[in-house]
């Protein structure tokens, strides 16, 4: 796990009734890119238990450079995903980068 050093938090505000459709699109997207994006280590989708219009998408990265390259304006696959799901958004996602200081999953 020590090769996961950075995380991008994507806070998504969805229109009413769009969560299931958006989650399906996100899962399909990640299934297609896994193993094909340098430095990409995985993702997690979190659905807010109290607010059905909020979803968090966390992406995990080997390096900040890998993460920044992926989230650049020149990434057409990400741009295409955003264009496809944009009608489901209440507003554009908020993106925040984090340095992972400690990451442990108990076995």
Where does each model-flagged region fall?
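Non-catalytic surface loops within mature trypsin-like serine protease
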Residues: 14-16, 63, 99-102
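Glycine-rich beta-strand-turn "strand-cap" elements at beta-sheet edges
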Residues: 1-4, 44-53, 81-107
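Short, well-ordered beta-strand segments in beta-rich or mixed alpha/beta enzyme
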Residues: 6-13, 42-73
């Amino acid at each position: 796990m020590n090769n996961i050093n950075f995380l991008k938090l994507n806070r998504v505000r969805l229109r009413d009734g769009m969560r299931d459709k958006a989650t399906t699109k996100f899962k399909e997207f990640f299934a297609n890119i896994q193993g094909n994006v340098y430095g990409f280590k995985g993702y997690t989708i979190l659905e807010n238990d109290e607010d059905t219009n909020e979803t968090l998408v966390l992406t995990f990265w080997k390096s900040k450079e890998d993460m920044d390259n992926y989230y650049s304006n020149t990434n057409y696959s990400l741009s295409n995903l955003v264009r496809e799901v944009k009608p489901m958004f209440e507003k554009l996602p908020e993106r925040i980068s984090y340095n992972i200081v400690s990451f442990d999953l108990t076995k």
